[in-house]
């Protein structure tokens, strides 16, 4: 079973950090980057996703006042070590559109709940043609933009790199979760 837990110093993430490092997930391979990098934000929270009591993922949300006062950046530091879960792929584009993946079922709702559904929420992606965010920037944002879940807001220099900023339509997203219940047992 999945469970998402707010990060705290008592969590043993040694193996999670080690695996993230071995996979080149440099934003998730130690506490300094995953958690401490947000210490100067007005509000911040990191969560760890567990499957059968093993840490298998992470996500963060924080105030995004540098972009817009009172706004939040969500789905930061998103990572899933899917080889430790029964759900290893988003499957088809149609399944992805119906939110049959870990980010939609666990990470995004957790971030929305923490921020408040009426808050101004944004995700950021790296538009560079290389790097770990390439598929997120090209594929996922394309699907979510076509379905009205996100809207391109700007391209900005942020945290040392060019990033695309996307406004999240949290009301639409949460209503679609009700419309499309999880049909994969591995997402329940």
Predicted regions and their residues:
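C-terminal "cap" of GNAT-fold acetyltransferases
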Residues: 152-188
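Conserved beta-strand-loop-alpha-helix junction that forms the acyl-donor binding cleft
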Residues: 113, 121-141
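Short, high-confidence coil segments that cap the C-terminus of an alpha-helix
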Residues: 43-44, 116-120
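A conserved beta-strand-loop-helix scaffold within acyl/acetyltransferase catalytic domains
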Residues: 26-82
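Residue-level recognition of the GNAT/N-acetyltransferase active site
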Residues: 80-83, 126-128
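A structural microfeature
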Residues: 57, 76, 148, 153-154
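Short amphipathic alpha-helix that is part of the acyltransferase structural core
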Residues: 1-33
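Conserved acetyl-CoA-binding loop-helix of GNAT-fold acetyltransferases
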Residues: 86-113
